[in-house]
């Protein structure tokens, strides 16, 4: 039996054991919830009576069309994501990994719903893949965030539904028992935004409306090296597993990047805006702390831990997003030019790749900044 098949079988067996352990707990929890609802006089929701909408997800940094304020009552929002194991080049030198992805991108797509909507996800693991996968939504309640109910082997699919009860931005990620770090640091994570039904609010409770939204997924990679210090390449994910674990245990990333690769949000792929545009940036890091900073700008309104029931912090220079969290920052651009958006651990930004650009068009405002004396010889 090859190392790859041994590893795959081990993953499947672990997943089966986990499902067996969780099932009795899940049955007990469901019975308790039903009893509590009956005692409180709350009628169970008849899902069949709710309107349904199908959403086509888009590749980050872009986000699918959505209403900022809910126009109806709660509804069932249907998504489909296909798991894709693929080779991915993560820097300009051609360093290659076996990425594990939701819908083929690192990060996976940003999903947007409103508070008290029902998220219904069809999760597909094609038979072209080699590993068991699942999904853990930090926005969900119960069954390991859905991870215990969504374990799919290659050639299988499943559908999960959960109620989005907490407004905010939240991480989701793959979480197969015993291999969670490997899957997450191979790119298998993303975010979901649960908007308040009446939209975002400032610290005084006044509406905040954005003109554009971008999703930045920060990813730490741990690429094994050979004895000469060169990055290794592997034919299959299973072949890389033991070396990948050794690299992860150093707790020292070889790359920390935005949206899957060094430079993925720079140059022709830079994020764009215009002076006066209000931009919301959702930023997630499923594994490590990060410190977003917009060089030349600020966070006018910031939810660093991403939870919209809390009033935003104002006028932030840098904000801390803990590992395993998504945050959100709202900024109105006031000057044209190129802005660097970075993780302000500057080693991680400039040496490891955690940086992107905003290209902003418009008229320069001398009142905000001007060159009084141009650089010249003394």
UniProtKB/Swiss-Prot annotation:
Gene3D superfamilies per the UniProt record, alphabetical: Cupredoxins - blue copper proteins (2.60.40.420)
**Could you say which residues bind Cu cation 2 here?**
138, 173, 344
Q: Where is the signal peptide?
A: 1-38
Quote the pathway field: Nitrogen metabolism; nitrate reduction (denitrification); dinitrogen from nitrate: step 2/4
The enzyme class is oxidoreductase
Q: Which domain of life is it from?
A: Bacteria
Record bears the keyword Metal-binding: yes
Sorted alphabetically, the keyword list is: Copper, FAD, Flavoprotein, Metal-binding, Nitrate assimilation, Oxidoreductase, Periplasm, Repeat, Signal
Residues holding Cu cation 1: 133, 174, 183, 188
What's the catalysed reaction?
nitric oxide + Fe(III)-[cytochrome c] + H2O = Fe(II)-[cytochrome c] + nitrite + 2 H(+)
Query: Which GO BP terms, alphabetically?
Result: denitrification pathway; nitrate assimilation
Molecular function via GO = copper ion binding; nitrite reductase (NO-forming) activity
Q: What does this protein need as cofactor?
A: Cu(+); Cu(2+); FAD
Domain note: The type I copper site in NIR plays a crucial role for electron transfer from pseudoazurin to the type II copper site of NIR, which comprises the catalytic center of NIR for the reduction of nitrite.
Q: Which family does it belong to?
A: Belongs to the multicopper oxidase family.
Assembly, in brief, is: Homotrimer.
Stated name of the protein: Copper-containing nitrite reductase
């Amino acid at each position: 039996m090859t190392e790859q098949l041994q590893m795959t079988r081990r993953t499947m067996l672990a997943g089966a054991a986990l499902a067996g352990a969780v099932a009795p707990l899940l049955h007990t929890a469901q019975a308790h919830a039903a009893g509590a609802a009956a005692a409180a006089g709350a009628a169970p929701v008849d899902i069949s009576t709710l309107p349904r909408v199908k959403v086509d997800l888009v590749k980050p940094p872009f986000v699918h069309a959505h209403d900022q304020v809910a126009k109806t009552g709660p509804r069932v929002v249907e998504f489909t994501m296909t798991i894709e194991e693929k080779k991915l080049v993560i820097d300009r030198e051609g360093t290659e990994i076996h990425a594990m992805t939701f819908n083929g991108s690192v990060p996976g797509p940003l999903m947007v719903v409103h508070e008290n909507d029902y998220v219904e996800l069809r999760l597909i693991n094609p038979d072209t893949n080699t590993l068991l996968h699942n999904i853990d939504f930090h926005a969900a309640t119960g069954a390991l965030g859905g991870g215990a109910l969504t374990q799919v082997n290659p050639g299988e699919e499943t559908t999960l539904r959960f109620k989005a009860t907490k407004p905010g931005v939240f991480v989701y990620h793959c979480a197969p028992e015993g291999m969670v770090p490997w899957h997450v640091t191979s790119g298998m994570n993303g975010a979901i935004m649960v908007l308040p039904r009446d939209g975002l609010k400032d610290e005084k409770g006044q509406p905040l409306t954005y003109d554009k939204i971008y999703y930045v997924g920060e990813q730490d990679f741990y690429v094994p090296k050979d004895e000469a210090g060169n990055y290794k390449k592997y034919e299959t994910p299973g072949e890389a597993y033991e070396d990948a674990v050794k690299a992860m245990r150093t707790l020292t990333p070889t790359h920390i990047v935005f949206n899957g690769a060094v430079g993925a949000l720079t140059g022709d792929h830079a994020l764009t805006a215009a002076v006066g545009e209000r931009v919301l940036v959702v930023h997630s890091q499923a594994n490590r702390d990060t410190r977003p900073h917009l060089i030349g700008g600020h966070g006018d309104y910031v939810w660093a831990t991403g939870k919209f029931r809390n009033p935003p912090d104002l006028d932030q220079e840098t904000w801390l997003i803990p590992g395993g969290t998504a945050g959100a920052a709202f900024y109105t651009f006031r000057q044209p030019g190129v802005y660097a958006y970075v993780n302000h651990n500057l080693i991680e930004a400039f040496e490891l790749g955690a940086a992107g650009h905003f290209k902003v068009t418009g008229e320069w405002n001398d009142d905000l900044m001007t060159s009084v004396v141009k650089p010249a010889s003394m």
